[in-house]
């Protein structure tokens, strides 16, 4: 008589394929996952509570450490929320610098996802190529703000520093280079039969399920939902650029891959246009008081980060610190669908599905 029993398996919290301190407790019967339970909180630092005792400018460095792979968009969302409350008009040159910084950051973030996701499923070379190009972007951002990862570049009213001499020209030269490398990525990976067998038909969910789980970003668009805040609710100067939003149709790991790869191409279009339209001169910071006090009231803003919709809610009582601060962190919401995706899957697909969701634990835990 054959007898089977379920086995409890811990993935993490230090497993290399979780890309952070994330633990996944799974029950398996043979090689089939019966249940998956994410365990989070290992990187929780209480950012929102700490912010209640900080001035608005002091909060910006804390946002760098949420989604640390896309710190510029985190910088922007807190500044945008305060600027909305204060009714500030941002200098045009500062807006272009912000867009350039955010879109370069988006490309760098997707490169990390591409390289590490493929490394997890056994392809080593793409990881090396991805980090080669990412290093070029990091060097550009380092020249702009003096930091490689946690930038603290944006300010309420604009940005901290203007671009150094020759920086715009370097960004302009990077665009055609990156396009050429991107074509090489597709030649290397996108048509590879082994890779396609690992991602096609794996981790499928519908548009209705994506919406019910509050998914956003590529995790939503892979199901065919055409929704991107840069297009649908334009902020900053995104309405000045010509670009389209990549969408999928099936909602599997392959569609998520295609959406993110095409997003790199669209970000390059935005960067190219921003360089062409970049103002020759002008201020990079609006006239704001040294001690910023948001007027009494509430504001909620949301923008499109590489992982989806990141939002910032501020309740102010008129003081120099927020009365309440709340972030909508897309990685936290995107993670919620993971147990549903893993149930009934072969354990070999676990890392493929987890990598396709593309979470950052600093953002999940907050």
Swiss-Prot record:
The keyword Glycosyltransferase does not apply. One of its GO terms (molecular function) is NADH:ubiquinone reductase (non-electrogenic) activity. Its main location: membrane. NDH-1 is composed of 14 different subunits. Subunits NuoB, C, D, E, F, and G constitute the peripheral sector of the complex. It catalyses: a quinone + NADH + 5 H(+)(in) = a quinol + NAD(+) + 4 H(+)(out). This is NADH-quinone oxidoreductase subunit D. It is an enzyme of class 7 (translocase). It comes from Bacillus thuringiensis subsp. konkukian (strain 97-27). It is found in: Cell membrane. Pfam families: Complex1_49kDa. NDH-1 shuttles electrons from NADH, via FMN and iron-sulfur (Fe-S) centers, to quinones in the respiratory chain. The immediate electron acceptor for the enzyme in this species is believed to be a menaquinone. Couples the redox reaction to proton translocation (for every two electrons transferred, four hydrogen ions are translocated across the cytoplasmic membrane), and thus conserves the redox energy in a proton gradient. It is a peripheral membrane protein. HAMAP family: NDH1_NuoD. Keywords: Cell membrane, Membrane, NAD, Quinone, Translocase, Transport. Belongs to the complex I 49 kDa subunit family. GO terms for cellular component: plasma membrane. Its EC number is 7.1.1.-.
